[in-house]
């Protein structure tokens, strides 16, 4: 995070992940301006598919120019991800950073991206669904209303910051899997 990676290093890293005991890779259309999913997809294709029992985790993303994040945008986002990753379904599909959208009702309303996310799970486009965002208070409200399988939160549960404690306690108590992203504060606590 925070620096560019050339094609060779990216492919080498992705192959090393697939060859390791790791069984999950998390990405997004917005990571590397779309290059992250594309690079992962190229390696998946070269290898003849995903390794057995490997989980691709990616995210539905808002339109970065308009900040729009309704059901239509969510549907377009999954189509872009499936094409880039060269897979026909996603192991773990998150709704990404809804706190940055123009209008929260685009997310939570009856024609919102949340309803569309769960529809994608029903359709088999995603095996499991999650919520990925930073604002723990809003995240807690949302996971209390929707039957998520997982959450991913970043920089809110570190050695110095425990803002996600209530969120993680609720998730744990309700069998919602937790991915604690950036436990070293995006590298700040590791340098």
Show which residues each predicted segment covers.
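Beta/alpha (TIM)-barrel catalytic core signal, keyed to glycine-rich beta->alpha loops juxtaposed to Asp/Glu
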Residues: 98-191
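A structural motif
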Residues: 22, 87-90, 126, 148
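Conserved, mostly hydrophobic/aromatic
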Residues: 10, 17, 25, 40, ...
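Acidic (Asp/Glu)-rich catalytic clusters
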Residues: 19, 41-55, 82-88, 142-146, ...
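Active-site mouth loops of central-metabolism enzymes
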Residues: 1-8, 60-75, 104-106
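Active-site groove signature of glycoside hydrolases
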Residues: 82-104
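Generic structural signal for well-ordered alpha-helices
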Residues: 14, 37, 41-44, 78-82, ...
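N-terminal binding-site loop/beta-alpha segment at the start of enzyme catalytic domains
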Residues: 1-54
């Amino acid at each position: 995070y925070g620096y560019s990676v050339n094609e060779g290093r990216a492919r080498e890293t992705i192959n090393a992940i697939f060859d390791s005991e790791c069984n999950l890779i998390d990405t997004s259309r917005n990571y590397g301006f779309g290059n992250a999913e594309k690079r992962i997809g190229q390696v998946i294709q070269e290898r003849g598919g995903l390794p057995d029992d490997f989980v691709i985790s990616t995210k539905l993303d808002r339109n970065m120019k308009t900040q729009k994040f309704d059901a239509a945008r969510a549907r377009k986002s999954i189509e872009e991800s499936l094409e880039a990753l060269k897979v026909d379904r996603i192991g773990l599909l998150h709704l990404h950073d809804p706190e940055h959208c123009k209008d929260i009702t685009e997310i939570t309303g009856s024609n919102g991206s949340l309803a569309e996310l769960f529809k994608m799970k029903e359709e088999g486009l995603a095996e499991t669904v999650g919520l990925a965002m930073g604002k723990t208070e809003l995240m807690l409200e949302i996971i209390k209303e929707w039957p998520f399988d997982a959450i991913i939160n970043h920089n809110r549960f570190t050695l110095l910051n425990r803002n996600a404690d209530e969120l993680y306690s609720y998730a744990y108590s309700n069998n919602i899997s937790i991915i604690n992203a950036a436990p070293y504060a995006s590298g700040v606590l590791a340098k």
